[in-house]
Design a protein with these regions (language model features):
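GST-like domain detector, emphasizing the conserved glutathione-binding G-site
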Residues: 1-66, 70
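Short, hydrophobic secondary-structure boundary micro-motifs
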Residues: 12-18, 40-42, 96-100, 125, ...
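All-alpha amphipathic helical-bundle segments outside canonical DNA-binding/catalytic cores
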Residues: 17-25, 75, 93-105
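GST superfamily/GST-like fold recognition
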Residues: 42, 97-122, 130, 136
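Active-site rim elements
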Residues: 70-77, 96, 119-122
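Amphipathic alpha-helical packing segments from all-alpha helical-bundle domains
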Residues: 73-90
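Long hydrophobic alpha-helical segments typical of transmembrane helices together
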Residues: 122-155
C-alpha cells in the first residue's frame, strides 16, 4: 500500500498525505510506530503468556511461569501500557492518526489496536482507543472486508 501510495497509483494514492506536510510526517511516524514499537510489545506479551501453557516437564513449569510473569511485570506490561497511553493521548486530540482523513497509518495501526484491545486491555482505561476502533469497524470498507474475509479473530 505504501509503495503504491508513494507512486500515486491506484485507489490508494489518497491514503497518503502530500509529501512534506505535517500529515505526511505523522503518517510515516505512525506507520513505523505500529511495527517498530507497538507490535514488538504485543508480540512479546503473546509469547510470554503462551510459554507457560506449552507442554514441558512438570518441574520446569513453575520456573517458566515465574520467569514469564516477572518479565511481563517488569518489562513488557509497563512498556505496553506506556505505548497505549501515548496512543490514547494522540487519539484524544486527533480523529485519525495522520490528519483529518483516514490514511495508510490508520490501516497499519488498526491491527495493533485490535490486538491490544483483544488482549484484555481495559477498554475503560483507553476510551479514545476504543472510540477509534469503533470508527474503524463502522467504515463501509471495513464492513466489506469482513464480509469477504470473515471476522477478525485474535485467538
Amino acid at each position: 500500500v505504501e509503495k503504491f501510495g508513494q507512486q500515486g497509483r491506484g485507489d490508494v494514492a489518497h491514503l497518503q498525505p502530500p509529501v512534506g506536510t505535517p500529515a505526511y510526517r505523522q503518517c510515516r511516524y505512525w506507520m513505523h510506530y505500529a511495527e517498530g514499537s507497538l507490535m514488538n510489545w504485543l508480540v512479546m506479551k503473546l509469547v510470554f503468556v503462551t510459554i507457560p501453557k506449552r507442554p514441558m516437564p512438570f518441574f520446569v513449569r513453575p520456573i517458566a511461569r515465574g520467569l514469564c510473569e516477572k518479565v511481563q511485570a517488569t518489562l513488557i506490561d509497563p512498556n505496553l501500557q506506556a505505548a497505549l497511553a501515548f496512543i490514547e493521548g494522540h487519539l484524544g486530540t486527533h480523529r485519525w492518526f495522520a490528519g483529518p482523513e483516514i490514511t495508510m497509518a490508520d490501516f497499519q495501526m488498526s491491527f495493533a489496536v485490535e490486538a491490544a484491545l483483544a488482549r484484555g486491555t481495559q477498554e475503560s482505561q483507553y476510551p479514545h482507543l476504543q472510540a477509534y476502533r469503533e470508527r474503524l469497524v463502522k467504515r463501509p470498507a471495513y464492513q466489506r472486508a469482513i464480509k469477504l474475509g470473515g471476522p477478525v479473530i485474535m485467538a
